[in-house]
UniProtKB/Swiss-Prot annotation:
Classification via Gene3D superfamilies: Ribosomal protein S20
Annotated protein name in UniProt: Small ribosomal subunit protein bS20
Keyword annotations from UniProtKB, A to Z: Ribonucleoprotein, Ribosomal protein, RNA-binding, rRNA-binding
Keyword rRNA-binding: yes
Natural source organism: Opitutus terrae (strain DSM 11246 / JCM 15787 / PB90-1)
Any GO CC annotation of this UniProt entry: small ribosomal subunit
HAMAP family from the UniProt entry: Ribosomal_bS20
Pfam families referenced in this protein's UniProt entry, alphabetically: Ribosomal_S20p
Location of region: Disordered: 1-21
Length: 86
């Protein structure tokens, strides 16, 4: 349990940020799954649209500090590799 007023506020902020971060990460996982299914279906248009949505979400996650920029670069590289390989 936090002892000082500032520690109580920091704990409250930590919980709030944790919830936000989990939401963003869950959205990224969902978009990645949609991308994988679009690629497996073989439809180029839906694959490209899913790739754009996923990369946009990854960039927004980097901007808000949820994901490190190197992790995002690796994820976007992976997307380009699987979408544009065909």
């Amino acid at each position: 349990m936090a002892n000082t007023k500032s520690a109580i506020k920091a704990a409250r902020k930590s919980l709030r940020l944790h919830d936000r971060n989990q939401g963003v990460k869950t959205r990224l996982k969902t978009l990645h799954k949609k991308l994988e299914t679009a690629v497996k279906s073989g439809d180029a248009a839906s694959s490209k649209a899913a790739a754009v949505a996923y990369t946009s979400a990854v960039d927004k996650a980097v901007k808000s500090g949820v994901v490190h920029r190197n992790v995002a670069a690796r994820a976007k590289s992976h997307v380009a590799k699987i979408v544009f390989a065909k």
